[in-house]
Amino acid sequence: KDGIFSKISKDIRPPKNAILINGRGKHITAGIIDCHSHTALSAVNEGSQAITSEVRIKDVINPYDIAIYRELAGGLTTANLLHGSANPIGGQNAVIKLRWGSTAEDMIVEDAIEGIKFALGENVKQSNWGDDYDYRYPQTRMGVDQIIRQGFNSALDYKNTWDKYEKSDKKTIIPPRKDLESEALLEIINGERIIHCHS
């Protein structure tokens, strides 16, 4: 009913206006959920810096991507759209319900738990492959670890700066600069954003 299974039974008496489909030889399942997808996206890596927690996948969803139509035909109904794996700390995710012909905004599942993409290992070390790209940091697993630690430490410093400002007189002090990168990392620390880690 309205696109949702309403009853499963051997002896169902459908209402008069129901459309009957002969299911003999067919497989019926609930909608498939893809927990790691790049559907409806292009250029999913922001490679300009190692930490890009301020970028948001929901800002670049392409509702005209033919993959949406094809995946719906295959039974996929929901996808967790993730940033690429070129950064130790990548961008913010978006969970969508695949709706062919809909807008990007209408596909976003607003009450989904907020997430962010992290990555370890070879993708991060060599996101720009080849000998000509040996200048990008990090180049080792030690560097990946250091970048992640630095990101969280910077976010905590940012929080402390704002805490001091909030406790101050405020009349004689300029407020700290807003930092979207640190704010996303603080959401992780506060349990408001979960990490999806490619490793």
Predicted features along the sequence, with ranges:
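Short clusters of hydrophobic/aromatic residues that line enzyme substrate/ligand-binding pockets
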Residues: 8, 55, 96
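Metal-associated gating/positioning segment near the N- to mid-region
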Residues: 23-88
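Solvent-exposed, flexible loop/coil residues
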Residues: 12, 16, 32, 55, ...
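Solvent-exposed, charged interface segments at domain starts and junctions
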Residues: 6-10, 27-36, 136-143, 153-156
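Short Asp/Glu-rich motifs
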Residues: 18, 40, 90-92
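Histidine-rich, glycine-flanked metal-binding segment
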Residues: 1-29
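A short, polar/charged loop/turn motif at coil->beta-strand junctions and beta-hairpin connectors
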Residues: 14-15, 49, 189-191
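Polyanionic/metal-chelating signatures
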Residues: 72-199
